[in-house]
Swiss-Prot record:
ATP binds at K612. PROSITE patterns: AA_TRNA_LIGASE_I (PS00178). It comes from the Bacteria. It comes from Brachyspira hyodysenteriae (strain ATCC 49526 / WA1). This is Leucine--tRNA ligase.
Length: 853
């Protein structure tokens, strides 16, 4: 019987769909498991990165189902966003039409892989039944004082024609989505006050240690940026207060200048008349840089001085492009001797350097310094702090400032409030109106959802919503007068920050979800997605969960109990640097580079993340058609551990296909043998030696596969163990009825062990071989520890360190017997006869080495 994967896979996919095989129970038992992968943006085409991510999740879900858990494994669509709007402009189609068509296409593609999704719980963020509740949450945040509107400098992408949050600007100063240049622009924007939760977000990372990757925790910790220091009230030379935040009050006597952010509110009012125009020019220049990038640190003197409260000294005040207006007070004290950035700035503008922390050999002198001394040491030239260690001086300086009333200890965070305004159409509308009489007024909950208008003209440029009179013109909910609807839509991360909770009660039209349903399933037991979301989606989701907790919708403190960040899928890229052109694998095979006048040796070959731009993407649908879904699933799970990058290889997926064919052919070989069909039970003691050996190997394989999956999700080593077992199964000669019954049990267990990864073929074989239930209804096989220990082992015989024979020996063999067997071996004697035996060495459980001359 031929292994026709196309027919088999279609059969089981139809069966699972028709029988609602993966429908979630409404009320799980205590034995529940919620596995979730980050839902995709519906671009219309699935890529191998999706396949890798979703196969990991599906294998985990199927494994836990076999363990007897109630499973929640849903799927949905992160469906708002700019690509749909850009497609509307390009293809003259509405974003909704484009998006829903893409969803249908991607859903069909996902189903080709046999994933165990409960499609009854599908959510689509661009549909009103979902985004209504996003608006509801925003109103609740507004009520609690967590949502506000303010003007200020924002990150602006001209290409996308919208605002970007700080997290959406790359370290290179470009847009995270389009790689376009990011500039500064002044706008009135909506913000969520995530800083109110900074302390919790930081402290609760401890709850995730051991369950989330260390690097993700470190990235979030750094992004939140908790630092303990002091607020010190300096004064301007006219007596006005000038507070600064510092983490190094031990260096306060070393301040030789002060720096204030170039975009500090009221900066120009601080400047002297003589310096105002210079500062204005500097502000214009600074607006063009991105403080995330590596740029030249510059400043300009404001004409003003600031008085140090510790010693009364005056320090010049500079406007500087490296100071963040949003951090601390927007101004910093500069200590050039002990901060490298301050040192470089001081050297550039000829500002004095004053040593106040001395090293161990007392050798620091300001005039000899070529770089700042940033280590701890002993405080000098600092009056009340002299002689103290740096750490003790920090405490003493804070105590002194507190006693004198010009300072206090302060915990500061780098985390900024979440800017959620977007000047685009295809997003969730903000539920507010602007009334000339009443100002900004929230829309009543009874009027939700505020739906997007359909009479929209899509052009490159300004926000299309502003041009829709039917949308913009409305009445004020407060006074009934004329009002204009808010035309900013929300950052799409507001949609993805709570979707995991909606899955627990996906069709509730009275509230976002029933708390009892949410608390039965949450937190998510296993969340899977890319590390690129560490400081955006994952941080925002943690904030949103805490907010939902605080308004009584969920219990607990964290949404995701365990996180796996899967590796990328890589493939060879082929680039002509000369032409700045990438070739596909097929074009390379056809030598199309020759038509461009390029030699093969001039093509740069790199293993890189699959992408359209690098022309190295692989279409999963094509591979499934060639080799089947199970072969693709096995390849992506076998090629590397889930957290590591996976290198695509045509040979690799062919190898997975051969593996499945071997299983198919071997297992069906016994289908019609009477001893196999009649095999029911067996006695281990009646098994042949080969049979006993295979049964022990089977039990050891169960143990290894279970540990590899449950403890580490290392499906790659689990598959390797199953391949080893298959090799042993392929060569055994079954000697009696007990052997056949044992072999039948091994086949049954083998199919269950492989089922989470290759569900179609294993289920088909399970039925053909008449094992009764479907695997879907079975339970995971368990090993018997007594059969995980070998009765025998392979004893190696060496002569002068070279292997000359191997025998099977009893595990309890004595040293004398082992040596005697070695000396009696005919293969050994061929190398020892006629020679002088110097010594015989026995290494217990491994080998005998005979040394001869």
């Amino acid at each position: 019987m031929e292994y026709n994967f196309t027919t088999i896979e279609k059969k089981w996919q139809k069966f699972w769909k028709d029988n609602q095989s993966f429908k979630t129970v409404s009320k799980p038992t205590d034995k529940k498991y919620y596995v979730l992968e980050m839902f995709p943006y519906p671009s219309g085409k699935m890529h191998m990165g999706h396949v890798s991510n979703y196969t990991i999740a599906d294998s985990i879900a199927r494994y836990y189902k076999l363990l007897g858990y109630d499973i929640l494994h849903p799927m949905g669509w992160d469906a708002f966003g700019m690509p749909a709007e850009n497609a509307a402009i390009e293809h003259k189609t509405h974003p909704a039409e484009w998006t829903l068509k893409n969803i249908a296409n991607m859903k069909d593609q996902l189903n080709l892989l046999g994933y165990s999704y409960d499609w009854d719980r599908e959510v689509t963020t661009c549909l009103p039944d979902y985004y209504k509740w996003g608006q509801w949450f925003i109103l609740k945040m507004y009520e609690k004082g967590l949502l506000y509107r303010k003007g200020g400098d924002v990150n602006w992408c001209d290409h996308c024609n919208t605002v970007l949050a700080n997290e959406q600007v790359t370290p290179e100063g470009t847009c995270w989505r389009c790689d376009g240049e990011v500039t500064k622009k002044k706008l009135e924007q909506w913000y969520i006050k995530v800083t109110d939760y900074a302390e919790q977000l930081d402290a609760d990372l401890k709850l995730l240690e051991g369950y989330w990757p260390d690097n993700v925790i470190a990235m979030q910790k750094n992004w939140i940026g908790r630092s303990v220091g002091a607020y010190i009230n300096f004064n301007l030379d006219d007596g006005k207060a000038f507070p600064i935040f510092t983490t190094r009050p031990d260096t306060i006597y070393g301040v030789t200048y002060m720096a204030i952010a170039w975009n500090y509110d009221g900066l120009l009012d601080m400047c002297t008349t003589e310096q105002k125009s210079a500062v204005e020019e500097f502000i214009k220049k600074s607006a063009k840089i991105d403080q995330k990038t590596d740029y030249e640190k510059e400043g300009v003197f404001t004409g003003r001085y600031v008085v140090n409260p510790f010693n009364g000294e005056k320090a010049p005040l500079y406007a500087a492009n490296f100071v963040l207006a949003e951090y601390g007070s927007g101004a910093v004290m500069a200590v050039p001797a002990h901060d490298q950035r301050d040192f470089e700035f001081a050297k550039k503008y000829n500002i004095p350097v004053k040593v106040v922390i001395q090293n161990a050999d007392n050798s620091l002198k300001a005039e000899n310094m070529t770089e700042a001394y940033t280590e701890d040491g002993t405080v000098v030239n600092s009056d009340i702090l002299n002689g103290l260690s740096s750490r003790d001086a920090i405490k003493r300086a804070i105590e002194y400032a507190t006693e004198k009333g010009f300072g206090k200890e302060k915990v500061q965070y780098k985390l900024r409030d979440w800017l959620i305004s977007r000047q685009r159409y295809w997003g969730n509308p903000l539920p507010f109106v602007h009334c000339e009489k009443c100002g900004v007024v929230p829309v009543p909950e009874s009027e939700l959802p505020i739906t997007l208008p359909m009479d929209i003209e899509f052009t490159v440029g300004d926000n299309p919503l502003k041009k829709s009179e039917s949308f913009v013109n409305t009445t004020c909910p407060k006074c009934g007068g004329k009002a204009r609807r808010e035309t900013d839509t929300m950052d799409t991360f507001t949609c993805s920050s709570w979707y995991y909770a909606r899955y627990t009660d996906a069709h509730n039209n009275q509230m976002p979800f029933d708390p009892s349903a949410a608390n039965a399933w949450l937190g998510v037991d296993q969340y899977i997605g890319g590390i690129e979301h560490a400081c955006m989606h994952l941080l925002y989701s943690r904030f949103w969960y805490k907010f939902m907790r605080d308004i009584g919708l969920v219990k607990g403190d964290e949404p995701f109990n365990r996180l796996l960040t899967q590796g990328m899928v890589l493939a060879n890229s082929y680039e002509s640097r000369e032409l700045k052109k990438f070739y596909t694998q097929e074009q390379m095979n056809n030598k199309e580079y020759e038509k461009d006048g390029i030699k093969k040796e001039d093509i740069i070959v790199k293993m890189e993340k699959m992408s359209k731009s690098k022309a190295n993407g692989i279409d999963p649908a094509e591979i499934i058609e060639l080799f089947g879904a199970d072969a693709v699933r096995i390849f992506v799970m076998f090629v590397a551990p889930p957290e590591k990058d996976k290198e695509w290889s045509d040979e690799g997926v062919k190898g997975s296909s051969r593996f499945l064919n071997r299983i198919w052919n071997l297992f069906l070989k016994y289908k019609d043998e009477e001893a196999f069909k009649n095999g029911k039970s067996f006695d281990y003691n009646n098994l042949s030696k080969e049979g006993q050996k295979l049964f022990r190997k089977y039990n050891k394989t169960i143990k290894k596969v279970t540990i590899d999956i449950k403890d580490r999700f290392h499906f790659n080593t689990a598959i390797a163990a199953l391949m080893e077992l298959l090799n042993d199964m392929s060569v055994i000669k079954l000697a009696n009825n007990d052997d056949y019954a044992m072999f039948k049990e091994v086949i049954r267990g083998y199919l269950i062990l492989l089922n989470p990864i290759a569900p179609h073929m294993t289920e088909e074989l399970y039925q053909i071989l008449n094992f009764g239930k479907m695997i879907l209804e079975e339970r995971w096989v368990e090993h018997d520890e007594q059969y995980c220990k070998d009765d025998t082992f392979e004893l190696v015989f060496q002569v002068n360190g070279k292997i000359r024979d191997r025998v099977e020996a009893d595990v309890n063999i004595s040293e004398d017997d082992a040596k005697a067997q070695a000396l009696a071996s005919e293969k050994v004697k061929a190398f020892t006869d006629g020679k002088n035996i110097v010594k015989v060495v026995y290494v217990k459980g491994k080998l005998v080495n005979i040394v001869v001359k």
